[in-house]
Amino acid sequence: MSDSEKLNLDSIIGRLLEVQGSRPGKNVQLTENEIRGLCLKSREIFLSQPILLELEAPLKICGDIHGQYYDLLRLFEYGGFPPESNYLFLGDYVDRGKQSLETICLLLAYKIKYPENFFLLRGNHECASINRIYGFYDECKRRYNIKLWKTFTDCFNCLPIAAIVDEKIFCCHGGLSPDLQSMEQIRRIMRPTDVPDQGLLCDLLWSDPDKDVQGWGENDRGVSFTFGAEVVAKFLHKHDLDLICRAHQVVEDGYEFFAKRQLVTLFSAPNYCGEFDNAGAMMSVDETLMCSFQILKPADKNKGKYGQFSGLNPGGRPITPPRNSAKAKK
């Protein structure tokens, strides 16, 4: 019948994994119909599951991947290929890196094969107005066609927005929102939806913690807000939570705590964009909700795969510029 029903998932996953151990950068060219099938079938599954996922430990949580496909394979080598471990990814699968297509196709294939053990949240780059600019559109156009990029957009518009692990760990891509008073507000967001320029959905994908801010502050991205430590503490107390787990910012060690360990930032793309010496990290949450971190060290040009660390400039990160550069900062 439809492409999605004719998917040979094992063949697709097998071809995507065949390049393990190859020279990084080797492409895997699936057929256009196979990719379309992955988008349509995963979209169905996303819509059949809640927009605010309720998950159970044990699981492994990963931050931004940004088209760094060979680093994604390293994460799975380290954490165990599905279904050996349960996974939650926090968004930003595409853009910036060279292999957004392989990255998103493997993730969607695993979602379809293991729908109750493998979860993907939406990042700010799973949005047409952003990935039109930062690489994914161009990669789709060069390797396939614009129509396929639009099929991905339809899929991304149905991704879940946030997850709560064992009623204690709140997970999203960006951060908190001044509009977020109850979890029911997230549950009421209707899909498919684009990411608006402001409001709850925008903030969950775009906001950032800032140690120098009390309450809410302006965000130098030109989108959403920053929030201080006491905003985190109040949110956790109000909702009887222990931890916020988010991604969205490159951090030197792959993970970084904020607000007395009440929030953690995860970033899973080592040597981000080839410009940074950051590590990538994955957070393992065990049955008792104890969190530990597995680190992918940055490759050092002179020392091979697991070289020494240099560092980021304090606070240094490539930021995504405003969605609309003419728009005044909030």
From Swiss-Prot:
Which branch of life, at top level? Eukaryota
Tell me the residues on which N6-acetyllysine occurs: K305
Could you tell me which residues carry N-acetylserine?
A: S2
Q: Which GO terms describe its biological process?
A: branching morphogenesis of an epithelial tube; cell division; circadian regulation of gene expression; dephosphorylation; entrainment of circadian clock by photoperiod; glycogen metabolic process; lung development; negative regulation of transcription elongation by RNA polymerase II
Q: Where in the cell is it found?
A: Cytoplasm; Nucleus; Nucleus, Nucleoplasm; Nucleus, Nucleolus
Q: Which organism is it from?
A: Homo sapiens
Return the similarity comment: Belongs to the PPP phosphatase family. PP-1 subfamily.
User: Which cellular component appears as one GO term in the record?
Assistant: presynapse
Q: What is this protein called?
A: Serine/threonine-protein phosphatase PP1-alpha catalytic subunit
| Broad class of the protein's primary localization | cytoplasm
Q: Please describe, based on the UniProt annotation, the reported consequence of changing P50R.
A: Promotes SMP complex formation
Task: List UniProt keywords, sorted A-Z.
Answer: Acetylation, Carbohydrate metabolism, Cell cycle, Cell division, Cytoplasm, Glycogen metabolism, Host-virus interaction, Hydrolase, Manganese, Metal-binding, Nucleus, Phosphoprotein, Protein phosphatase
